[in-house]
Amino acid sequence: MAQEKRDVEINSIQDSLDMLTPEIRPWPVTPPPSAEEVSTQVYTKRKAEDFLGWVEDNVKFEKSFGKAEALAGLKVLDIGLWRLGHKFAASMLAEAGAEVVCIEPPGGDPLRQLTPFGREEYMLADQETGEKCGIEFIAEMVNQYAITLDVDTEEGQQVFRELAANADVVIEALPPGYADERGIGYRHLKDLNPGLIYAWTGIRGQWGPDKDRLSKHGQWEIEPFACASNAWIHSTGYPQDQLPRGKGGDPTRAGVWIADYVAGEQVAVNIMAALYWREEFSGEGQFIEVTGAEALMDITDFDMTWYGFNKSIKARTGAWDPNLNQYEWNPCKDGYMMIGGQSDRLWYRIGMCIERDYPQFGRLIHEDPYLKEMGARNALHALIKTYTLTTRWLRDINRVQAEEALLEYEIAAGPVLFVDEVCEFPHFKYRPWIYNCESDYGTFLYPTSPNAYQFDTPHRLKWVGRRLGKDNGEIYSKWVGYGPTRLAELKTEGVI
Amino acid sequence: MCDVIWCKKEVDGSPCETVNYLDPFCFWNWEGTINCAECRTVYYIHMIQGHMYKGPEERPGEEPDTSPLYADKPLEGYRNYMFATEGRTRPFECMPRSFLLGEADMVKFSIRGKPVRGWRPQPESAGIAGSFPYHWDIQNLSPDVWEEYQEKIRKGEVSDW
Amino acid sequence: MSKKKDPRVTRIEDLAGPKSPGELEEMKMPYEEYCRQAFDPGNEAKKPESLKGIRWLSCTMYIFTPHSAANLAELGAEVIKIEIPRMGDAMRHTSPFNEAYLYPLHESRPMTGTGLGFTNANINELYLTMDYHIPEMVDVFYGLVKMSDGLTELYRPGTLDKWKMSYKYLQEINPRFIYVWGGGFGYGPKVFGGSYDILGQAHAGLASITGMHEYMGGHATKCTNWVIDWASGTIITYGVLAAIHWRRKTGLGTMLEVSQVQTPTRFMGYSVPLYGRFGIVRQRWGNWDTQLCAHGIILCGKSDYPDADNPQEKFDARYVMVSAFNDPDFQELCSVIGRKDLWDNYPRHKQRLEAEAQIEVYDALEQWAADKTRTEVSDALNNAGILAYNVKNHREVYESEHLRQRGTIRWLDDPLFGDLLTHCTYSTGLMSKSPRRLKWQWRPVGADNVKIYRDMLGIPVSQVEDWYEKAWI
């Protein structure tokens, strides 16, 4: 395709904005390899073309839309503001086929207004109405219907009860006791709908001496509060011995609101378990509570068990893992390179690979009697020595060279990729792990659900976020039988 | 010589032959003076993107800005200097305790004083084909530890938390 | 929709409020008390298990795939972990700085322990050993498949297929079977690339947006723990439970192909769509937030425990999470730290969210905190009604009354290994009627060989012993 060329002078972001569209700067920049190429150039190398051909025939992403949906018919209500945990759980259920309705107050979830560094130019406009919305909100509302309801009004509470009487699942992410005070909490709804599975999710809990708080002015706690309260931040980041404190050598939060995602997926798992128990055994719903602080604590490896063993407080170790050698990333010529291989078989193979270019590595590492035993290699001084010499090799080569060299030795190795590189990585484009969907807000590049590759019931993305209240008509009609006149009344009263 | 300083300084008529490891995140971009862990010779180095742009140049008489974290001597069976060896290597503060063992910690009791199977060797207790029961018969298998536990209870060294 | 009422009749169910003395008590109860009673931490064992009767095979190693099966075991499924004879899961040989092990690893290895790296990834499971390579084992394996609901495996592509143990074969034996192949990359050009948690963090972009910005002196930072391994494992569990739900209707199993490296990209919020639309490549932003200000972690001048022996307390009890992004909160914050000029300069959220403004705001906060301890800072802010929270360490987590009351930190009297502090299972979520529970942490390699080979599959003990001698099991 011929590309038009023109000269552009860029003095501010404004000068480049109209060029930053997918039409002018398409994704992907280069096409992924074809199935034919992958089969003949990759799969045949290890005589796996038959098996992988069979896998591709059956689980390929492109075939997912013709298949059944695992949770078809499941009705889910999601109510909450500000955070991503409940939204991620709701998205997971919706990706598997549930009918998920997201309830916002008539003013909308404040998350709709959030945009990186306050840049309104990075918000997207609804193609019908032009209403602007932040990208994070759109991204975390997969396959969900958007309706409005003010549960602070008595009428709104009644409407909520009617919706919930019809639902299989309610996901709630309001401050502790907020729904209960309004007569729409679990203890009220369970009588209306004994089969209802009701899941609350938040930061530290809706009960207990350190439960979730609001500020004096009503501001919510948002991630990373959860990560601060379970020692996760305490042990993330570079030690002050590697980088000066205040200049990179500090406890560090994740770049994303990670506890929200971790809690969200456990909300979805617990809901599915409760659903199985309801359908298989009891016919009864139940009450679930998942917090970011605790769900993330669940997956902090052995940390607390180690404290109970000999009062160890896990220290941060930067990009090095204290349990395995090698298992780290270190700087290289054009970024950072991750290398992993702990067992003797893999560890010596890494050495053989590096030795080819840098013979001294083999001498200093493989001859050292203190590095011969797998467990002993995890001692701190062994990490310092191994990684210093590994980096001595890496500094002369870039990520792609390191990856190619190490893959030749069947070592798990990978570059630290930036977002553009992630989106252009051939493997990711091939599956595809990211792809463009045509949304209400125009072309929207999206990471695929990891459960999208299945024989029979792959999870899938059908649409992303919608404008505020877009589905009021459809959902109120289907779920509770309200017609246009009734909706108009509710709108006038400010209930929806 | 980069990323490591292989010190060849003549000391008492023979070269020092100590490898000082310059850990990558600290020294990736760095300028200053550093001592050899063995002979304490001070070197000036200027590292840019992991490459030694200048140095190592000897700076006799100067105090070093820093020290390596670890150094060893390949010609002497890899005799080594661990971190935090005073005057030779840099301390490493960011640790889970004030000391590291680097080898298995033999633990018989948890921090609240109850028995935990954290020591070796354990007496044989398996059945057929490596099967184990669902019960640690500590009284019979490790009566000494059980006795020690009773003693701890008597002394009030066992608590709920 | 509420049913049409007969206006002449007053039925008790139509009246608002409780319908019996018991319900009256329940409705009068303060909400916190109600929650506490509903979840009743510590009494999980007295309640039914959600996944009673499900049996799952865990042909797994490391953290990612084991966790996907352990989630099922926590919820009441019977999970059989199949390991390499004598050696077991590679994860058993990992321990922080080589220091913490529980003994023994295996009957024949009294001097080798299982490292704490194995913790939490395989709880409540039965431990079987089997060498799949041995032709005699294939039929035994098929026996397990016929008696089970599904399997999770992580072998290199085609490995189990070579031994006729892939879904291609197993669906013939058991059409209800649900098969999970959890790999690093899955089909595609990098299908043979191995993977680890840290590789996922690096490769999928999470590392590129975590850590201090270059101008702050930082590098791409690894999220602590094997967080992506665990989180991807839970994604599998969810896929499995959805498939089980579908199977209840259709009687048919399925195969899932799940890639661990993909998960972190899905966790990155606006990053990918922002790139797709505008070509903007999200960068690291350290301890601050790209969408809220003030909402970040600050360094205080003094430690809370300057005399502590443990360096983690002595040097690092210095960080506070501070959050005041709404206008009134930010105004209050500026007044507490004596910098009303900041409020005058940045009265709108959009203004204080600009990068330059953030730098100014957090600098001002750290200057104000320079002569204070962590707790002095958080107390001063909390007393003013602003949200602030100490960045806690593991001792503080252990001593948290909140987590103790909720049962999410508790001691386990492990049947085989004794007294273990535990932070898993209960912490994944409280459930009022069919909660998760922790029965045991792990068992030695092959600890349930007789229980499964003889008691379940009916193989004579002499045969089992013979296989054991040959190291087939």
Positions of predicted regions on the chain:
Chain C
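Short Gly/Pro-enriched turn/cap motifs at secondary-structure boundaries
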Residues: R109-M111, F118, R282-T290, G296-I297, ...
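Substrate-binding/catalytic subdomain of NAD(P)-dependent oxidoreductase enzymes
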Residues: A243-G286, H394
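An anion-binding loop in the catalytic cleft
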Residues: N43, K302-S303, E313-R318, R374-T375, ...
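Aromatic-enriched alpha-helical interface/lid elements that frame and gate functional surfaces
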Residues: A294-A384, A388
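A glycine-rich dinucleotide-binding beta-alpha-beta segment and adjacent secondary-structure elements
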Residues: A384-K439
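N-terminal helix-loop segment corresponding to the beta1-alpha1 unit
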Residues: S2-L252, V450-I473
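Glycine-rich beta-alpha junction loops
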Residues: R86, G184-G186, Q260-T265, K302-D304, ...
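A short glycine-threonine-serine/GTX helix/turn-capping micro-motif
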Residues: A220-A231, M255, G286, C293-H295, ...
